[in-house]
Curated annotation (Swiss-Prot):
Biological classification of the source: Bacteria, Bacillati, Bacillota, Bacilli, Bacillales
Biased composition (Acidic residues): 587-612
GO molecular function: ATP binding; ATP-dependent protein folding chaperone; unfolded protein binding
UniProt entry tagged with the keyword Ubl conjugation: no
Positions where Phosphothreonine occurs in the chain: T173
Induction: By stress conditions e.g. heat shock.
Matching Pfam families: HSP70 (PF00012)
Keywords: ATP-binding, Chaperone, Nucleotide-binding, Phosphoprotein, Stress response
Region of interest (Disordered), residue spans: 524-560, 572-612
Protein name: Chaperone protein DnaK
Length: 612
């Protein structure tokens, strides 16, 4: 049975983990790093993912970053005449993660637990599941990031009853969850968050400040220059990280742009105090969901035993200070904020596989679910923070006489009016027998599975006719689209592999041409001109094949040249052997001649007494 890997598919970075010997371990990427940038780039038809893609982002406009912010929307990005959905871009990242996880584990990986922000709605969860499918992964479970973090943190503390608050500030999303841990049960009590707030926003306030200051000095708006913007983004991210450890940092961007007088440079000192001032609104925005999570759980800050930080942005000192002030305690530093979510996902994979025993995870739905009823209001069937999986049903009736069909408008959100909430889907129940309004009995049932994905059913209790829908938002992908993307992803994987093989073959051919020249030079007059000529012409044929780009020809000509070079080397070896034998023969003769000069002598023993 293949292992289930745990993937934290992040906005800025992603991480993958697997259970090994009863413990979750992080799988390093090919560069040896424990997290990989969630960046995809396209260059001359080739796809680049992770570190490589991020490194060349400044010079390559065909680079996609922070795609997670667009999951579950109809956003598309156009690269080299082709449009990509967020699901496809995420699938490219997942394919990359899957490939290096397979190299590490040593076997094919087909199943995964993928984490999402707790505040992801149904469309965003479905999009994540689709991305996994396109990448060739069966997504066994979608779990909330704060829940995964609590699982990784609390797995060795099962005997202690604790109420913990998980503060998760990632690259593009923010969540707070409160969990009760005890006797191996992890129960989410409440969750709150903001899907449009994260580390990227902290970078942006630094970028805006740099643009503003530069404009003041030079009357040039750097935000209109694409390459300058990418350099500013990298500098802002670095400054943000530096200011977590030092109180001020130098930002230096030479040749950022050119003015009438020539090239211009950006030089600036950024203090931690200035950064705190610029980002104070963002920090305060994280406090509102924190208070909401506490009030939803009917808890006060004194009821919280531990505060766990998740996400790289929680390293910002102002964030830690705000948490300490709000909750009256220092957050726990016992877990790595970049890795803890992936570790928790791997533990959940272990639970599903049966490797981790006596652990029960009770998650909640982050938003209320209901339908639109008369007067365009939302009637809730499942309240937010309800433990999942769950189901609920309610009976409704018709709004007009002789109404033969009802439209079921499925909604997710906390607002009273239907138009203010998120539409998850619509479907129709038809063939209702004509009757006065209020007479027909229509039962509407909601089911939420463990992944947080919703099924809705409407049934006419009079005729037992029913209609159901698995919610896929208007921005979601149809099964046909997912299948097409799966096929494309597989083809791309094959194409990438073929491209890699071509590069390897070209490198081997170039190396062989170099070796041939060296061998011919070393042999000099030790082999016949005819043999040398054969090798030279085989080498020229290989060069021509390389220029033509026909890989079949390159392979054939490479094999032919290898044969010639081996023959030349063999002749050289024979010659060296002959010379060695000849030399040892001459040495033998010489020593024989030396023996002829030896004088035989008789020895007689001399007695000491005779000498006297």
């Amino acid at each position: 049975m293949s292992k289930i890997i745990g993937i934290d598919l992040g906005t800025t970075n992603s991480c993958v983990s697997v259970m090994e010997g009863g413990e979750a371990v992080v799988i390093p990427n090919p560069e040896g790093n424990r997290t990989s940038p969630s960046v995809v780039a396209f260059k001359n038809g080739e796809r680049q993912v992770g570190e490589v893609a991020k490194r060349q982002a400044i010079t390559n406009p065909n680079t996609i970053q922070s795609i997670k912010r667009h999951m579950g929307t109809d956003y598309k990005v156009k690269i080299e005449e082709k449009e990509y959905t967020p699901q496809e871009v995420s699938a490219i990242i997942l394919q990359y993660i899957k490939s290096y996880a397979e190299d590490y584990i040593g076997e094919k990986v087909e199943k995964a637990v993928i984490t999402v922000p707790a505040y992801f709605n149904d469309a965003e969860r479905q999009a994540t599941k689709d991305a996994g499918k396109i990448a060739g992964l069966e997504v066994e479970r979608i779990i909330n990031e704060p829940t995964a973090a609590a699982l990784a943190y609390g797995i060795d503390k099962e005997d202690q009853d604790q109420t913990i608050l998980v503060y998760d500030l990632g690259g593009g999303t923010f969540d707070v969850s409160i969990l009760d841990i005890g006797d191996g049960t992890f129960e989410v009590v409440s969750t709150a968050g903001d899907n449009r707030l994260g580390g990227d926003d902290f970078d942006q306030v630094i970028i805006d400040h740099m643009v503003q200051e530069f404009k003041k000095e030079n009357a040039i708006d750097l935000s209109q220059d694409k390459m300058a913007t990418q350099r500013l983004k990298d500098a802002a991210e670095k400054a943000k990280k530096d200011l977590s450890g030092v109180t001020q940092t130098q930002i230096s961007l030479p040749f950022i742009t050119a003015g009438d007088a020539g090239p211009l440079h950006l030089e600036m000192t950024m203090s931690r105090a200035k950064f705190d001032e610029l980002s104070s609104d963002l920090v305060e925005r994280t406090m509102q969901p924190t208070r909401k999570a506490l009030s939803d759980a009917s808890l006060s800050k004194s009821d919280i035993d531990k505060v766990i930080l998740v996400g790289g942005s929680t390293r910002i000192p102002a964030v830690q200070e705000a948490i300490k002030k709000e909750l009256g305690q220092d957050p726990s530093k016992g877990v790595n904020p970049d890795e803890v979510v992936a570790l928790g996902a791997a533990i959940q994979g272990g639970v599903l596989q049966g490797d981790v025993k006596d652990v029960l995870l009770l998650d909640v739905t982050p938003l209320s679910l209901g339908i639109e009823t008369m007067g365009a209001v939302t009637t809730k069937l499942i309240e937010r923070n309800t433990t999942i999986p769950t189901s609920a049903s309610q009976t409704f009736s018709t709004a007009a006489d002789n109404q033969t069909a009802v439209d079921i408008h499925v909604l997710q959100g906390e607002r009273e009016m239907a138009s203010d909430n998120k539409t998850l889907g619509r479907f129709q129940l038809t063939d209702i027998p004509p009757a006065p309004r209020g007479m027909p009995q229509i039962e509407v049932s909601f089911d939420i599975d463990a992944n947080g994905i919703v099924n809705v059913r409407a049934k006419d209790l009079g005729t037992n006719k029913e209609q159901s829908i698995t919610i896929k938002s208007s921005s979601g992908l149809s099964d046909d689209e997912v299948d097409r993307m799966v096929k494309e992803a597989e083809e791309n994987a094959d194409a990438d592999k073929q491209r890699r093989e071509e590069v390897d073959l070209r490198n081997e051919a170039d190396q062989l041409i170099f070796t041939t020249d060296k061998t011919i030079k070393d042999l000099d007059d030790k082999v016949s001109e005819e043999d040398k000529q054969k090798a030279e012409s085989a080498k020229d044929e290989l060069k021509q094949a390389l220029e033509s780009g026909d890989m079949e020809q390159v392979k054939a000509k490479k094999d032919a040249l290898e044969e010639h070079v081996q023959q030349l080397s063999a002749k050289l070896y024979e010659q060296v052997q002959q010379e060695a034998q000849q030399a040892s023969g001459e040495q033998g003769e010489e020593s024989g001649n030396q023996d002829d000069d030896v004088v035989d002598a008789d020895y007689s023993e001399v007695d000491d007494d005779d000498k006297k």
